Amino acid sequence: MSGLKIYMDNDINLDLIKSKKIAVIGFGSQGYGQSLNLKDSGCDVILGLRQGGASDTKAKDYGLTTMSIPDAVKQADIIQILIPDEIQAQVYKEQIEPNLRAGQYLMFSHGFNIHYGFIKPPKDVNVIMVAPKAPGHTVRSEYKDGRGVPSLVAVYQDCSGESKELALSYAAAIGSGRTGIIETTFKEETETDLFGEQAVLCGGCSALIKTAFETLVEAGYSPYMAYFEVCHELKLIVDLIYQGGIEDMHYSISNNAEYGDLTRGEKLINKEVKAEMKKVLADIQSGKYAQEFMDEMASGGKRFSELRAASKGHLIEKIGSEIRSSFKWNRDNRLIDKSKN
């Protein structure tokens, strides 16, 4: 693609990140994946966590050094903030900002709090982003298999003159130089990431699956067959698209399936849906969505909890759980073990 620069391991100085002490704040999905990959790449990593908490125990079980967040910030050259978006600003204000010193690096894996101004860093620190384009469990599993996931890097403030090089070095240390690293901006990453999640990857996809499932069940079809046709098989199709684009997917499926795709797809995802997508994007660009999310979480997340409970209670979850527990393919090589990661 013209104008697209992809950085690989041979473009990057890995020794740069190895010369710094890295404090990873948080041990959720990304904290788990990134900190262990950094450790295995020979980096000097410490974890800033609530001492005695569940994450602290899990991190110690992996042989990682943990301490309080203020102590980790004081010791580190790089502070990678990997706690949930909704609590980053408060933790930053109370535990990180008072312990910052000039020349340190504040790092993020999502530009949300910087882009929307919930965190306002001092002018004498570097602010960078390394955003793996996969959940943390996949960041870890791909690294362990000798591969990596692509990452985006961005620079918001560069006091040192080497912020981009350091971001690239960090990305390589978590395995992304094996696959490819792309430069972007905090604005572009934040807005496209939120839109992708809401319109396709999470919101659009889950709503499409559930609506199609309901349509078949309400028409009298077995919920088990409905699950297989509109949910289980989705991965098989997405794998084809992931590897070779929509064209390769069309090449692999039957003429009947392709004709149905080309003649019926746009009847479902039509101009009205595109108009709604533009509204979703406008809310992201204006900051309206960001403020709504932060206000909801600050007020206790009552509506969020109700929506989450309704989703968990959908018939497709019961049917899916029953089907998955009956097949061996679901028990092998699971990425997520909630007791460990």
Feature names for model-found ranges:
Residues S2-T66:
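NAD(P)+-binding Rossmann beta1-loop-alpha1 motif at the extreme N-terminus of oxidoreductases
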Residues N37, S68-D71, V139-G146:
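Short, flexible, solvent-exposed loop/turn segments with mixed acidic/basic and small polar residues
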Residues C43, L100-Q104, K123-V125:
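A short helix->loop->beta-strand "cap" motif at the edges of active sites that frequently abuts
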Residues I69-I119:
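Rossmann-fold NAD(P) dinucleotide-binding segment
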Residues M107-Q198:
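Rossmann-fold dinucleotide-binding core
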Residues G161-E165, I174-G175, G180-A219, Y224-Y242:
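Active-site-proximal catalytic alpha-helix in oxidoreductases
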